[in-house]
Amino acid sequence: MQDFVIVVDAQYDFMATDGALSVAGADALVGPMRAWLSGLESERTAGVLFTFDTHVPDIYAASEEAREFPAHCVKGTPGWANMLDPALLDRAIPAWRIEKHVFDMWAEDGLLIEDARGDAMPPVPRDAFFDRLKDAGVRRVTVIGVAADYCVRWAVAGLVARGFQVVVPAALTRGIARQIDTVLAEDFPGAAVDTVA
């Protein structure tokens, strides 16, 4: 049985020490994340989805999120760029991307999951994409990225709600105020979510 992988918001503004909303310790994850992705095997991996936190200045300024965090991940800027190139993956592993405008990748209607390599695979509506994964026998999703207590937490919540088992490698995520062990203990007691080293 194959697993699926979601890489949450591994973007410059979060991962780099001089990013607009740098997550403490995230810069140290870049090398291990690249090595981990490079080591995925196509026989065991149904695909990898890269999420992109994506903002437009005028819209962001009026958002709830702007009350808590400074502007970050403005589309088309260096801070929006993914620090993990899909070329790291075995070519036989499908690579996908989704742009979201809020913490929760499940909250917005109409989001499309698109090919991350430019291979001209047609976009797929988000919910239909995950339905297809389940129909194909995918039961477990591994989630890595930042921030553990925001966008990673919401990614996990949506997966659990859709019946997936979730695994979060603790060494491949960092939080802002809470780390993943605390997030899972406080927010997902009894859920099908585990951390691994």
What is each of the regions a protein language model found here?
Residues 12, 56, 148, 174:
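Short, glycine/acidic-enriched loop or turn micro-motifs at the edges of active sites
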Residues 1-5:
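Extreme N-terminal starter segment of soluble prokaryotic enzymes
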Residues 98, 190-197:
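Short acidic-hydrophobic, aromatic-tinged amphipathic segments that line or gate anion-handling sites
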Residues 15-25:
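Acidic/histidine-rich helix-loop elements
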Residues 6-7, 11, 51, 98, ...:
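Generic enzyme active-site microenvironment
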Residues 31-140:
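Active-site alpha/beta core segments
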Residues 142-145, 164-178:
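A short glycine-rich beta-strand->turn/loop micro-motif centered on a GG-aromatic cluster
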Residues 33-40, 150-161:
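Histidine-anchored nucleotide/phosphate-binding helix
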